[in-house]
Amino acid sequence: YHLHTIRTSLLKEILNHFEFSQKEINKHVLKLINNGDVIFTHCHSTNVVNSLIYSKKKGKKFKVYNTETRPLFQGRKTAVELMKNGIDVTMFVDSAAAFAIKKDDKSDKIYVDKIFLGADALLKKGVINKIGSGMFAEIASRNKIPVYIIADSWKFTKDKIKIEQRSLNEVWDKSPKNIKIKNPAFEFIKRKYISGIITELGLMKYKEFLRKIK
């Protein structure tokens, strides 16, 4: 009975933290979004999606570009959740991300104002997130578009992270035996591509976040 009480109390504490964290993240994202912004996101991050929905409910007017996120199409979940909350969403195939993010050569117009990415792990040297995230951050950096990581500070770890290789069947079911298929689930986003990080601790530079989290 005593162990059950401890477990219940611990679970409540964890849930309270995540609820508090999301509320704080929402406030900082709301301040960051300007009316008329086009925000690009990738995969499905609960922190990102919830904060965008919150900003919409608070009256901010913005559009979202997102990726389908192959091979499991998590981007569809993001698009549907945003659409159901009245947010204007345009979904791109993953390989068209550079087309969505880059400057227009004729008008020099940048299609995207900000990039919001979630995080599977926050590390000292950068962030681990869904495969494709590092590439999108690099494209954004070349076009001088700010990249913001939106995540709970509890995702910080000093452990070494091994990139998970997932089943080839996710990519090509019943593929010919002599064709090798690589299906990495995540990749690294270098710190130099990250303009800022939003956690329950606030919006700050990644260096500052590392100082606070110690």
Predicted regions and their residues:
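N-terminal active-site beta-alpha-beta segment that forms phosphate/nucleotide-binding
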Residues: 1-91
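Conserved phosphate- and dinucleotide-binding cores of soluble alpha/beta proteins
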Residues: 67-214
